[in-house]
């Protein structure tokens, strides 16, 4: 649940009961129980679906909003022998989205006209590996930066523009700037 709430991409691989035992109660079925707190949750009972389901899982891990993925595999499948043609796994591509140019222009106009702007950087900046770009932008524009707890290391805390971390708790400086800011990016 925490990984889902924090948009953390992790792959969970729990074992499952043999298919013949899955209909008996009480049986914990992870793929069913975790469906609402994962991006993708599935069970593999047939070796012929193994490659396809792993491709689907890794596509979910690589694309869109980050989050946990679960593939539950029946124990007999893990212990069995593969019969038939060796599957050809192809890693799915990572698709990147791009901000709309019109939206970027409007945000930039609002930022340029702001008198007391502030940046809140989250873990998306970490996943994008944009720490250098963030620092360069903040320094060039002279905009103070606070980070979310998950994005804490994206901006140096000893930097003169650093306001510290904000989340359920917030530093006094970040709270002051957030209350006084006329534009938060």
Give residue ranges: language-model regions.
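N-terminal alpha/beta PP-like core and its mobile active-site loop of ThDP/TPP-dependent enzymes
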Residues: 1-185
């Amino acid at each position: 649940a925490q990984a889902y709430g924090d948009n953390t991409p992790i792959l969970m691989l729990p074992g499952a009961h043999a298919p013949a035992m899955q209909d008996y109660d009480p049986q914990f079925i992870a793929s069913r129980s975790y469906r609402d707190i994962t991006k993708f949750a599935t069970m593999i009972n047939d070796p012929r679906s193994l490659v396809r389901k792993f491709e689907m899982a890794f596509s979910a891990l690589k694309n869109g909003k980050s989050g946990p993925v679960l593939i539950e595999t029946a124990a007999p499948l893990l212990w069995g022998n593969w019969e038939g043609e060796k599957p050809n796994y192809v890693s799915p591509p990572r698709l990147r989205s791009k901000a709309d140019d019109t939206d970027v222009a409007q945000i930039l106009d609002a930022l340029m006209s702001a008198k007391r702007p502030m940046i809140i950087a989250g873990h998306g900046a970490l996943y994008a590996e944009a720490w250098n770009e963030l620092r360069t932008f903040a320094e060039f524009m002279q905009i103070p930066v606070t980070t979310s707890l998950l994005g804490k290391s994206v901006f140096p805390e000893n930097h003169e523009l650093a306001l510290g971390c904000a989340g359920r708790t917030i530093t006094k400086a970040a709270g002051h700037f957030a209350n006084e800011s006329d534009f938060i990016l």
